[in-house]
Amino acid sequence: MRFTSFPCSLLALCLFATPPLLAQGENDQPAPAGAPAATQQTPGEPGTQTGQPTPPPAPAPPVQFTRTIPVPPVRYSGSLGSTYIPLDSWMYPEIMRLYSLGFIDTVFLGMRPYTRTSVAHMLDASAGEIYNSDSDEAKDIYSALSRELAPDLEIPVDAHRGHSEIESVYTRMLGITGPPLRDPYHAGQTIVNDYGRPYAEGFNSITGLSVRTTLGRYSGYFRGEYQHAPTLWGYSTAVASQLSFQDEVFPLTYYNPTLPYGATLQGVDTFRIQEAYLAANFASHEISIGKSDEWYGPGRGGGMGYSNNAENIYSIRINRVEPAYIPFVSRFLGPIRYDFLYGSLQGHTAYNSPYTHSEGFSFKPTSNFEFGFERTIVFGGKGHEPVTWHTFLKGFFDINDTTEPEKIGRNDPGARFSAFNFSYRVPFVRNWLTFYSDSEAHDDVTPISAPRRAAMRPGIYLSHFPGAPKLSWRVEAVSTDPPTGRSIHGSFMYWEAEQRQAYTNKGFTFGDWIGREAKGGQSWLTYHLSGNEWVEFQYRNVKSAKDFIPMGTTQNDFTVSAVKRLGKDVEVNGWVQYERWKAPFLLNGNTAAQNDTSIAVQLTFYPRNSIRRY
């Protein structure tokens, strides 16, 4: 395949790009509307050079976010550190809805997570427009988001102060009756986009907390949790041997996280670090090291390039968290964001401990249209090529097809996957309907150059219905079985001849949960109670190809969920899911449908009084 070096040149140019021009100045960022306005002093008043010494400031009153006209914003530095918002936060569906209602034009849907201050800047840019609109839904969302982000927005531009706080404390109780599916690389999953958390029939639980801190341009984040799950019994020797043969992973062993075999998952009682990183902000670049969320693509159900379906990896990351303006380029392509990640993968046996790096670029030519490119490479591993600067740069800059001797030797550029996504607010119904698509190709420059060899996840989002402003609907289709002869036996998407467990981390696909050679879809019908509360019905369907899993597989999930606040700082998130699945080959030819029911309740406490400033 042929990869050009254009992304490399563009990345170098971006490092010298100027940030987007704001109303207050080139490098100053505004606080959200509703924050107290900065006051001016005249000579001779207390606190000036010609007056009396400044007395100790009185405690600032709480910021009130109401539906009143925004006051002049306070100036904030664009170089202050800020932590990422976790991908499972309630804020992301509300941000998407606010965009689809016709606001926050500066958001980049295809590149997540966002930092807390970047979301605050999006809100500030649309504050006046939201106020002047007749959309009560937009005002409710704006108020809820602004209140959540208020603690980050009280640091004056000339004070490199910081603060620490317990962001959340949470516990989730999950009961599963009936045999669930937990084989993301083959047959499918009962629970998706859950950071690869363990689950099995019986009682499962997680209890955790998250803390964050900032000091000037520096920030840190930690999220850890205790996890409990019963024993999960895997496949018989005959089934596991057949699947291992198709994967070309030999010999068959009990330790193979991508293939549940026997008592693969013993009862789990462990503490897991979900996220932990230190970061520094330089010219709107968040440079971090550690474990953080990653998502490429505008979809809700999954991201072809990256998602939170698997446990996060430890990585070094450079993320342009604010849109950049590049001279000449941005005249045609608009503001740009980019993200670079390099880290190690776990749970591989062929080969053990490979590395991965990804590069993503997103462009916004207009306020209604966004498109982006992303590339992921998996390389190295024990028994294969060494992980050196030579092998890294070989994959990063390689522009040629790979020969077989090169592929099995020390100069293998790695398993290369490229993605393309876009989103578009549809003309004439821009405040109603958003159309988007995500795609990924294996061994091609981009999915655009080879659409018949590309996996797809298209979708539409209707932000509200005529006469029912609180009701929204979203639907997505997904396929990793493109119409090409190469898509056979599960040996195309998310698989590679050398890196045979390529797109997995600890057994879970870190791209789209649909996995290899499957087709399906999802739909969400949501009734919004407020800016951070809703009731939702979800349907999910999956079918795996018969040439991949003998006799094929079928899954149908029906889920009812609700998110409700008890007061302002306690969130209750509950859901009930009924699943009906068929996988005759996995059950030694049994064609009867299997059923399982999952019931979960999660309580999350956001302790506002835990903030400590310094």
Language-model-derived ranges and their functions:
Residues 81-84, 107-110, 131-140, 213-218, ...:
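Short loop/turn motifs that connect adjacent beta-strands in outer-membrane beta-barrel proteins
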Residues 361, 564, 593-614:
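Outer-membrane beta-barrel "beta-signal"
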Residues 8-18:
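Bacterial N-terminal signal peptides
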Residues 220, 236-335:
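Well-ordered mid-protein domain cores that form the structural environment of catalytic cofactors
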Residues 210-252, 366-368:
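Carboxylate/His-rich catalytic cores and anion/metal-binding grooves
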Residues 21-202, 210-216:
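N-terminal periplasmic/intermembrane-space "pro-region" immediately following the signal or transit peptide
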Residues 109, 195-200, 262-266, 304-307, ...:
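Outer-membrane beta-barrel domain signature
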Residues 294-295, 313-504, 516-523, 528, ...:
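Signature for the C-terminal beta-barrel architecture of outer-membrane proteins
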